[in-house]
């Protein structure tokens, strides 16, 4: 691990005097959402992140090189690191072993007061004690001082006092826990979710080896990840399905006092900006001062270079938007006393980090461009092309703005609006085809359900510049009906419906339309997905009939179960089973009963847990490169169902 990636501890001792106690643990089980966000699958996975964050704190301090995360049979989790081991001596404030304090007292840890760690992540340092409080049981073993210490807990209470169970020739901590079924909606861990997070952490900490293993029977898999190139390799990974404009990943880094900043940049031939930022290894999706400093410096440096070499006239400078078209950049800062806005740490507030990042990018990127004129020209050419297209896009956006301002008068001809005006109570079905749109219009509850049929070939926005998207006649009705604008003008507060439901056939064509719409929402109306307004309707696949009795099934398994139920134990009873080819085959009553009635329907909310992964997936599915798409199809073919027959 290079010196840049390390932030050395204040001193090399790590004992009980570094553990500070701030408050008790009583509230965690009463209000778990305050500490881990939710008790859904997201919160379940957050337990793992909290323990891993503690191990990464040791890595940031320069004392840990290996972390292993294991999903055990029964969905218990084991996290092992080779750091110094949690202190086991007596903690001065409490007179109890520090290990006990760390796992039973909220806000007890070496990350407070500046004594144990200069740099630390975690959710406000609640870490180990919150995981303990929300676990049915937890066992922690510490290898330290040549001995193995062990403690056991249940729902935050001690079930076995700290004791020595053996000797050891190494140091580190191993934690195994089982989430409490009383606290969580699900106890099943998703390997891909954990794998993605661990890979991200390995990229952010150059040279740190993170291994993930799934030991559940029938699901065995795993990977050891170690990236000596750090965030440079992260950028290469993000761009793997894109065509880079230049081979090198530009790497810029610097230190001021106890703070470090590093930036990795590579442009590609797409029209999308992918900017991913972190503070103390915590993703900051809403940006903050580090992003502000980067953006300002990037635009300033490109303009200065362009003016110096006659590519840009003094009065025609490129904008920040132009400068970032096609960029993939990762920004990672490590700092003491990080100030995050909000409990979710979505935005970094430390003002001095802006100056640090701005200075690094200003100085080092200017030198890089001078030394690599071919790369500089390719970046400037792309920015200038974006600049020329921006004016056309601006005019198209202005047109949309004017239409949106007119409200109902500007609504699309094919929109069948609802009577209710309160967006919190309304929903819009975006439906494939006029025939399905007709059935949906007749079958809906017009008090709160609006219908917008789509027809013709829809634009693949992954391959189109913004001005083409803004002016597209197939997307205009969607933009206008939703009423919240597009691109940088998009404002969720202006949404006319708080449920945007994509209703398409359960076949290949329907899947394609869903993907095209989701790509559009992701690239040009991302808050729509981020704030949970987008849904996918789930129409039935089968109709089963026995005389006058009729049932519908939404999967092959449900079809078989209903068929057996309708036979009533008599295998000779004939059940007529027909597969719905499309939404247009259903009459209005059937469509209402199966797909639109809020009391009976199934809706799938589209969520965005990992923007980097989503970005790569949309590029792979809808971008120019065929080979990654082919590999994806071949890899996933075993899980596919027969969509067309």
Residue ranges and their predicted role:
Residues 17-30:
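Mature N-terminal segment immediately following signal peptide/propeptide cleavage
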Residues 30-49:
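Conserved short strand/loop->alpha-helix "switch" segment adjacent to the catalytic nucleotide/phosphoryl-transfer site
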Residues 1-15, 25, 49, 57-59, ...:
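GHKL-family ATPase ATP-binding module
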Residues 92, 341-354, 552-558, 562, ...:
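Helical (often loop-to-helix) elements that flank the catalytic cores of nucleotide-handling enzymes
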Residues 57-58, 85-86, 508-509:
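Residues immediately C-terminal
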Residues 86-109:
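Short conserved segment of the HATPase_c
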Residues 388-407, 422-427, 438, 442-444, ...:
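C-terminal interaction appendages of subunits in large macromolecular complexes
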């Amino acid at each position: 691990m290079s010196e840049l990636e390390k932030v050395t501890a204040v001193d090399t001792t790590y004992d009980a005097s570094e553990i500070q106690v701030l408050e008790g643990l009583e509230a965690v089980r009463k209000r778990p959402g305050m500490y881990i966000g939710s008790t859904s699958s997201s919160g379940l996975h957050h337990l793992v992140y909290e323990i891993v964050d503690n191990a990464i704190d040791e890595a940031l301090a320069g004392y840990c090189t290996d972390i292993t995360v294991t999903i055990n049979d029964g969905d218990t989790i084991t996290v092992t690191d080779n750091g110094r081991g949690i202190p086991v001596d007596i903690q001065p404030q409490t007179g109890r072993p520090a290990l006990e304090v760390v796992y039973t007292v909220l806000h007890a840890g070496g990350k407070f007061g500046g004594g144990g760690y200069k740099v630390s992540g975690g959710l406000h340092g609640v870490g180990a004690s919150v995981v303990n409080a929300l676990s049915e049981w937890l066992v922690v073993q510490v290898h330290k001082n040549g001995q193995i210490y062990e403690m056991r807990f249940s729902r935050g209470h001690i079930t076995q006092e700290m004791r020595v169970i053996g000797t050891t020739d190494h140091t580190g901590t191993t934690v195994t826990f089982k989430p409490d079924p009383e606290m969580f909606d699900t106890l099943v861990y998703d390997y891909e979710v954990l794998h993605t997070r661990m890979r991200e952490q390995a990229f952010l900490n150059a040279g740190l080896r993170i291994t993930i293993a799934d030991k559940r029977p029938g699901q065995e898999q795993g990977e050891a990840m170690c990236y000596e190139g750090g965030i440079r390799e992260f950028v290469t990974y993000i761009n793997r399905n894109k065509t880079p404009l230049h081979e090198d990943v530009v790497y810029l880094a610097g230190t001021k006092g106890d703070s470090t900043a590093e930036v990795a940049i590579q442009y590609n031939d797409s029209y999308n900006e992918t900017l991913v930022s972190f503070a103390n290894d915590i993703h900051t999706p809403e940006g903050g001062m580090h992003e502000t400093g980067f953006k300002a410096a990037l635009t300033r440096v490109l303009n200065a270079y362009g003016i110096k070499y006659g590519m840009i006239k003094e009065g025609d400078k490129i904008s920040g938007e132009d400068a970032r078209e096609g960029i993939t950049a990762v920004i990672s800062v490590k700092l003491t006393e990080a100030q995050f806005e909000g409990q979710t740490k979505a935005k970094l507030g430390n003002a001095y980090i802006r100056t640090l990042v701005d200075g690094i990018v200003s100085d080092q990127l200017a030198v890089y461009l001078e030394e690599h004129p071919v790369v500089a020209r390719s970046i400037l050419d792309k920015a200038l092309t974006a600049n020329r297209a921006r004016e056309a896009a601006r005019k198209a956006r202005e047109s949309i703005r004017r239409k949106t301002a007119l409200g109902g008068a500007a609504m699309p001809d094919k929109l069948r609006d609802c009577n209710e005006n309160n967006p919190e109570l309304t929903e819009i079905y975006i439906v494939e085809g006029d025939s399905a749109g007709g059935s949906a219009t007749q079958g809906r509850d017009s008090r709160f359900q609006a219908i917008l049929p789509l027809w013709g070939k829809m634009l693949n926005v992954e391959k189109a510049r913004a001005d083409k998207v803004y002016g597209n006649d197939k997307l205009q009705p969607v933009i206008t009906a939703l009423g919240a604008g597009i691109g940088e003008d998009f404002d969720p507060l202006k949404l006319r419906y708080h449920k945007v439901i994509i209703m398409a056939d359960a076949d290949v064509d329907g899947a394609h339309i869903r993907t095209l719409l989701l790509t559009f929402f992701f690239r040009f109306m991302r808050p729509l997905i981020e704030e949970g307004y987008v849904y996918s309707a789930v129409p039935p696949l089968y109709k089963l009939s026995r005389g006058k009795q009729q049932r519908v099934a939404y999967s092959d398994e449900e079809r078989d179960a209903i068929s057996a139920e309708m036979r009533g134990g008599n295998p000779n009873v004939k059940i007529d089973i027909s597969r719905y080819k499309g939404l247009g085959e259903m009459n209005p009553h059937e469509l209402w009963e199966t797909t639109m009635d809020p009391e009976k329907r199934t809706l799938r909310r589209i969520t965005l847990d990992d923007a980097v992964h989503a970005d790569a997936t949309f590029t792979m599915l809808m971008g120019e490169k065929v080979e990654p798409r082919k590999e994806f199809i071949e890899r996933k073919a075993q899980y596919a169902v027969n969509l067309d027959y």
